[in-house]
């Protein structure tokens, strides 16, 4: 897939900006706070309908305006696609594909596949379990857009079950109805099992790819292990055991859940452990080792999405390339070549190896305006 054109209207600090992409690599250069990351964020929104920077649409609409619009022309193997997203300060959204309004936003997902790599991704290693769960889920949505619906179902049941437990925890609350709790347990186990199984299946395909890239980048000096520990214990070779095991663990934790007013079993408590040569990378990995690990994960994402979707996704590198040493830059360049369209932001071109600049489209960004560099 290839992003040909992006058009921003009243988005962030852009009033009206159209960008034509004319090369496999586009480098956006300029000082901080000029709008480089905003442009990548617009592409992210068209892919995922989410921003990793903010949660409210009003923060995406230019100050003083009531709505903004992000549109793009994308070339897929099946033909051209026009994608449009209208954001309103009041939170209402409209999405369309080829000028046809899409009623369910979830049906908009899957038209534009991306892999993002920014300095925030170091939290994959350094952050808590929630960071790694969010990463798993984001990759899964790229591979299987229906997963967004399955995850939403689980989160809704979890929220309602927590509210039920919390309500009956109060001293003056009526006694908890065991039959009602059984119904909530069944719903949580059914939707949660689907989430766990998909996470497990995806990692089975991603782990070998990440291991290959990690060995290559580290010069075969380090061994990467990725351990997925579902909160519900079961043998992945026997997936039919997961649902009854889920219910069993809910029964075991029932009294504790009622005391705490909180669901203590389910994929919202899964963990992913990243090990380098058998040692937890979070506590003991050096900064260089952690960067190598995250780069290996991102390259694995690229390859896996390409395998599953059948087309190469876009790669968004947000102010991260200058943080990679020459070896890691070259490994990344060798991996993407010209097959993966890449959008790169940077404050200066001096940190780039000459090979990155060859045949790249270089755009200058200043105060919400994009100019072609000569």
Swiss-Prot record:
Signal peptide: none
Chief location: cytoplasm
Record keyword Membrane present: no
InterPro entries for this protein: DNA-binding_RecF, DNA-binding_RecF_CS, P-loop_NTPase, RecF/RecN/SMC_N, RecF_2
Cited Gene3D superfamilies: P-loop containing nucleotide triphosphate hydrolases, RecF/RecN/SMC, N-terminal domain
Localization per record: Cytoplasm
Residue sites binding ATP per the record: 30-37
Keywords associated with the record: ATP-binding, Cytoplasm, DNA damage, DNA repair, DNA replication, DNA-binding, Nucleotide-binding, SOS response
Top-level division of the source organism's lineage: Bacteria
BP GO annotations: DNA replication; DNA synthesis involved in DNA repair; double-strand break repair; SOS response
GO MF term (any one): single-stranded DNA binding
GO cellular component, one term: cytoplasm
Main function: The RecF protein is involved in DNA metabolism; it is required for DNA replication and normal SOS inducibility. RecF binds preferentially to single-stranded, linear DNA. It also seems to bind ATP.
UniProt xrefs under PANTHER family: DNA REPLICATION AND REPAIR PROTEIN RECF
Family: Belongs to the RecF family.
The protein's name: DNA replication and repair protein RecF
Source species of the chain: Acaryochloris marina (strain MBIC 11017)
């Amino acid at each position: 897939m290839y992003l040909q054109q992006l058009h921003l209207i009243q988005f962030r600090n852009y009033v009206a900006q159209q960008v034509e992409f004319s090369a496999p690599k586009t480098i956006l250069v300029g000082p901080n706070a000029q709008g480089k990351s905003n442009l990548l964020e617009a592409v992210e929104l068209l892919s995922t309908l989410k921003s990793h920077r903010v949660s409210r649409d009003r923060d995406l609409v230019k100050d003083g305006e009531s709505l903004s619009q992000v549109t793009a022309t994308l070339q897929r193997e099946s033909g051209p696609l026009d994608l449009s997203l209208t954001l309103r300060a009041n939170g209402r959204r409209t999405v369309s594909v080829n000028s046809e309004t899409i009623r369910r936003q979830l049906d908009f997902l899957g038209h534009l596949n991306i892999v993002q790599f920014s300095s925030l991704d170091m939290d994959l290693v350094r952050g808590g379990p929630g960071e790694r769960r969010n990463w798993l889920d984001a990759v899964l949505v790229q591979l299987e857009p229906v997963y967004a619906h399955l995850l939403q179902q689980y989160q809704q049941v979890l929220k309602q079950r927590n509210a039920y437990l919390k309500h009956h925890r109060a001293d003056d609350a009526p006694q908890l109805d065991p039959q009602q709790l059984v119904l909530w347990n069944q719903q949580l186990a059914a939707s949660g099992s689907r989430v766990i199984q998909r996470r497990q299946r995806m990692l089975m395909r991603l782990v070998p790819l990440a291991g290959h890239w990690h060995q290559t980048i580290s010069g075969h000096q380090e061994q990467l292990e990725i351990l997925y520990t579902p909160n519900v214990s079961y043998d992945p070779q026997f997936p039919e055991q997961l649902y009854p095991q889920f219910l069993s663990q809910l029964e075991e934790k029932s009294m504790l859940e009622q005391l705490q007013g909180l669901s203590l079993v389910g994929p919202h408590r899964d963990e992913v452990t990243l090990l380098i040569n058998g040692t937890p990378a979070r506590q003991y990995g050096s900064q260089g080792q952690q960067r190598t690990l995250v780069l290996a994960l991102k390259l694995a994402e690229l390859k896996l999405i390409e395998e599953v979707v059948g087309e190469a996704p876009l790669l968004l590198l947000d102010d991260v390339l200058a943080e990679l040493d020459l070896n890691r830059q070259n490994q990344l360049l060798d991996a993407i070549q010209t097959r993966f369209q890449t959008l790169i932001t940077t404050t200066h071109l001096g940190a780039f190896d000459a090979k990155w600049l060859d045949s790249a489209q270089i755009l200058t960004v200043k105060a919400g305006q994009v100019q072609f560099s000569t």
